[in-house]
Amino acid sequence: MFPLNNAFTNTNFSAGDGKALCATDHPTVGASDLSNVLATASDLNETSLEQAVIDLSDFTDSRGLQIAARPRRLIVAPYNQFVATRILDTELRPGTADNDINALRSNGTIPEGYSVNHFFTTSTKKWWFVMTDVPNGMKHFTRTPMQTGMDGDFDTGNVRYKARERYS
């Protein structure tokens, strides 16, 4: 969870372009800089999630052509899990007396729903992220696959287990 816990600073972690993971000025090859954060920082609510979906639809490739990015899943800290349920799972608009439909749910905007990340640090408890269907996004490599071993002691019947794996 290191990349997400440090997404807004590149003090400890920066992406391949030298910027923080969530930055307003990711350089592209031929087009203008790309922002993957809301113009105005906002807590998770219906309006901010709708704006994130709209912003995603404006993503362009290095030639300036729209790439039709779509959201797949909302990732939230435990602090926001009930807010996410209200936004994504209710039939009517959350938090209003209006009888409007919940457009996010009705349109199937976030098809995989939300998942709770229990490893966000205290300072990131209100953060939320939208996973997209954009290919070649954030990469995960298993540097050393899971290796397990065990050692048994015949005299005592004790058994020791170990496991090791590495990621990047």
Feature locations, PLM:
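Long, contiguous amphipathic alpha-helices that act as assembly "spine/axial" helices in icosahedral shell
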Residues: 1-12, 74, 161-163
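Arginine/glycine-rich "motif VI" loop of SF2 helicases in the C-terminal RecA-like domain
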Residues: 65
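Conserved helix-loop functional segments at active or binding sites
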Residues: 6, 58, 62
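Sequence/fold signature of self-assembling virion shell proteins
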Residues: 18-58, 68-73, 79-168
